């Protein structure tokens, strides 16, 4: 049975815990397929990588669908789907990673650690992009796309291998089980 999870939230520890909880509850209730309708402005990198690896570990088919905007670290959560689609008006935003450091006092070692962490996160992010899109773009292409704050439309997303098709979301009337994560 298909279960549909509606994820319309920023990526953070709380919303990813909600996603994990809903996925496990759906599987415990007999779900053989999870459809995740997504719209997210992105958010916390650690939470995004956690969600990606969690979804890839599930013993059921995961279909991700971009309802509107999938941005920043939400891109890799979207790429965890074994089937990936999006509405004709959807978009994907790629941009350089950043951390907010307002009011924080740190030493040189901590700044170096943060810089190394951001560099490593970028490499992991590009590893996922390359793997999930079957290498349709090179590492250098992905780095340019990210560094230039690029928006990919539905058509571009299909060309780049981010999704297989642009189509409207489908909500089965019955039987169906629905879950929500909102932020």
Model-predicted regions and their roles:
Residues 1-73, 79-183:
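N-terminal organellar transit peptides
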């Amino acid at each position: 049975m298909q279960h549909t999870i509606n994820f319309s939230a920023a990526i953070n520890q709380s919303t990813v815990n909600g996603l994990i909880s809903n996925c496990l509850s759906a599987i415990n209730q007999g779900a053989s397929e999870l459809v995740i309708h997504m719209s997210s402005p992105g958010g916390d990198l650690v939470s995004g990588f956690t969600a990606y690896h969690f979804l890839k570990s599930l013993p059921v088919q995961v279909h991700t669908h971009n309802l509107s905007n999938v941005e920043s670290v939400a891109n890799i959560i979207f790429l965890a789907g074994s089937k990936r689609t999006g509405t004709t008006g959807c978009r994907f935003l790629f941009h350089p990673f950043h951390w907010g450091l307002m009011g924080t006092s740190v030493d040189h070692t901590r700044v170096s650690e943060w810089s190394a962490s951001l560099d490593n996160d970028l490499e992991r992010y590009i590893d996922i992009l390359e793997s999930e899109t079957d290498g349709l773009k090179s590492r250098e292409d992905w780095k340019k796309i990210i560094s230039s704050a690029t928006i990919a439309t539905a058509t571009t997303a299909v060309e780049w291998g981010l999704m297989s098709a642009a189509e409207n979301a489908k909500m089965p009337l019955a039987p169906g089980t629905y879950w929500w994560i909102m932020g």
